Amino acid sequence: MLDGIHKIHLIGIGGSGMRAIANILIQKGYDVSGSDVAESAVISKFRDMGATVHIGHNKEYVNGVDAIVRSTAIREDNPEIVAAKEQGITILHRSDIVKAVLDVTDGIAVAGAHGKTSTTSMIGQILVEANADPTVIIGGEVDYLKGSSCLGKGHFSVVEADESDGSFLKLRPHTIVITNIEDDHMDHYKTMDNLLNAFCEFVETLPEAGKAIVCGDNENIRYVMSRVKRTFITYGLENNNDYVAKNIHYVDSSLVYDVYHKGINISRISLRVPGEHNVLNSLAAFIVAHECCGVENRFITKALGKFIGAKRRFETKGHVGGVWVVDDYAHHPTEIKATLKAAKELEKHRVICVFQPHRYTRTSLLKDEFATAFTSADEIYMTDIYSSGEDPIAGIDGRTIPDAVEAATHKVVHYVPSVDDIPAVLAKIVRPNDLVITMGAGSINQYGPKLLAILEEGLQ
């Protein structure tokens, strides 16, 4: 897969994007080492699989390796990067490994502002159900993989394509899925035009016989379609798409809808995950399996009916005393709005949203969109911004989004500056039949279990 390379060192091996790559490389038989800032269960797993993993970063860790693999998040002054440059060691981006996987398979790449992980996971689960033995690489963790990737022997691969840093343009898939395009990742793209141009380039990487499965409801995707000459198959809720989800309704706790192709009802899907956004994600997965992989309808419907979601995607953390605690990765206004709407539709719960803003740049650029993203929540709690390594921006702080929400909707936002205080604050106000959702891309996922522990202690 990687000519002339045997010993590979991964910087940040335990990170959400790198762990999937590490697992593939170890299974392929490469001599893998890595480094990260802290111990974790996944690092222990890699050691058990034969990898050498160091805690901390040191220039000596790259001695004798043929290549190092990094992500965009790794700084240039990292001692292992510096040493690799000094020694002339090949430096690969994680997307180079994803490309190498796609190059030797019939590759499917899923991109978009939201829904990438869920859609990629659904496609993978369908192919597993159909005994296609796929290779799967995603940015989250799912139960059916017992992690975030698997190395298959079949000729299909399905990968999550990361547009955040432009690295998805290296990939050469045979099939592309674009779930949506929105004004995110402006720290990299600077302007919406640059982002749209990148997606146009992405579609142009398809071979002439390749297909782009895209959500035709999205205005930005329609713009890309007008710019690029490729075969597009559209899906969505609007009737002008090739594939349309209709008759969406709940049956008990299952979300059910019919798949229409050019006006003809061809299938009924039943999902265990909530929300219209998951209807769209599953519809995209259906089309890929049906149109591009030749999977029979019975395998598709069975797999989608078994799908319970990826970790940090409406993930149940537990129930104590009638309080249901869920965690979700939503950190963009559109994701937040969709997730809270889905939560409100489930049953008659009081929905308590606990949001940790992610990055100063995103907070600054999207504060007006954040202002109306929380309307489905009954109670709103917010913490200080999780910087993700960014420098502060003058005039942007933890009160920016709460103030915007209160001004736009007249809803009360409870501002709790320190995220460490969240569990104790919530423990005093929750009651039976509450649904608490922790939301954000930072450290907020650690605090739902802490709330549950306090509630459990209170019952003893």
Please tell me what each predicted stretch does.
Residues 1-93, 97, 219, 244-246, ...:
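N-terminal leader/targeting and accessory segments in enzymes
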Residues 4, 24-30, 47, 61, ...:
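Phosphate-binding loop of NTP-binding sites
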Residues 10, 110-112, 438:
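Hydrophobic Val/Ile/Leu positions in short beta-strands of Rossmann-like dinucleotide-binding domains
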Residues 30-37, 212-216, 353-356, 378-387:
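Short internal beta-strands
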Residues 35-36, 54-57, 92-96, 137-140, ...:
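Beta-strand->loop->alpha-helix junctions that form or flank phosphate-binding loops
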Residues 371-432:
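C-terminal helical cap/extension that packs against the catalytic core
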